[in-house]
A protein has these predicted regions:
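The feature captures the beta-strand-to-loop junction immediately N-terminal to the Walker
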Residues: 60-62
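ABC ATPase C-loop
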Residues: 160-161
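Conserved ABC ATPase signature
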Residues: 143-147, 151
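Helix-to-loop junction immediately C-terminal to a conserved catalytic motif
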Residues: 75
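Conserved beta-strand-loop-alpha-helix hinge in the C-terminal portion
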Residues: 1-12, 222-245
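ABC-family nucleotide-binding domains
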Residues: 178
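Catalytic Walker B motif of ABC-type/P-loop ATPase nucleotide-binding domains
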Residues: 168-172
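Conserved ABC ATPase "signature" region
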Residues: 124-139
């Protein structure tokens, strides 16, 4: 790849993984972040919650309830109509968001170079270790755009695991995946809580049960439930998803 192309790729990468100063973000000494009175048009109204180190939050609700909108506000892609986000001033960088539109998040000419982009301090050994863990090593020299849907998801989660941030955001990370790929991604996402916190918008109750220790249930523009999960809470998850599908 030409040098100018690398520069363009890095500029694009900055959109997803950089410290951008925005007026509704306040820096304090706290946990990962706190959301206060966030409102967005007629989709979200007076959303309040905090995100603590070690949280793996499943963000659930019907289609169109505002899950993706909330993730994009946390990512600073869109600005809320009202409210603010209070961030830990020690946060290493902006949140890392993995969206459903996967191809828009690839900027280089190989799987290996995607892992290195924006992660210059990550060693080659670390890159190879994660590629092998996610069964992407044989594809390391392929174009990311040529991967299957499951392989692209695994690559994006791998990139997230090597990033310098401490807040990871995932929008339907198991959409269209088979059980084996879901298990691989679940295992890696569970490891991310050691670096900070994870928020996952999902319609997959089994994936939520395998990965999350907390549920935020959005309904009618607000938070209906914010619940800590225990190992034995599979019945509670089932009840919430039954309510969602009514």
């Amino acid at each position: 790849m030409l040098k100018t192309e690398n520069n363009n790729a890095l500029k694009k990468f900055d959109i997803f993984n950089s410290s951008i100063e925005v007026p509704y973000i306040e820096k304090v000494s706290a946990d990962v972040l706190k959301v206060e009175e966030i409102t967005y048009e007629n989709i979200l109204k007076d959303i309040n919650f905090d995100v603590k180190v070690g949280d793996v939050i499943g963000l659930v609700g019907k289609n169109g309830v505002g899950k993706t909108t909330l993730l994009r506000i946390l990512m600073k892609i869109i600005r809320p109509t009202k409210g603010k986000i209070i961030e830990n001033k020690k946060n290493l960088s902006s949140p890392f968001l993995v969206m459903q539109e996967m191809d828009y998040q690839f900027f280089t000419e190989s799987v290996r170079s995607e892992l290195a982009l924006g992660n210059e301090i990550v060693s080659k050994d670390q890159q190879e270790k994660i590629l092998k863990k996610m069964e992407l090593y044989k594809m390391k020299d392929q174009l990311p755009f040529d991967l299957s849907g499951g392989e692209k998801q695994r690559l994006l989660v791998s990139i997230a695991s090597l990033s310098k941030t401490n807040l990871f955001l995932f929008d339907e990370p198991t959409s269209g995946l088979d059980y084996i790929n879901m298990e691989r991604i679940a295992d890696l996402i569970k490891d991310l809580k050691e670096k900070g916190a994870v928020v996952i918008a999902t319609h997959d109750p089994e994936f939520l049960y395998k990965t999350c220790n907390r549920i935020i249930y959005l309904k009618n523009g607000g938070i209906k439930k914010d619940i800590k999960l225990r190992v034995e809470d599979s019945t509670l998850i089932e009840q919430i998803f039954n309510d969602i599908t009514k």
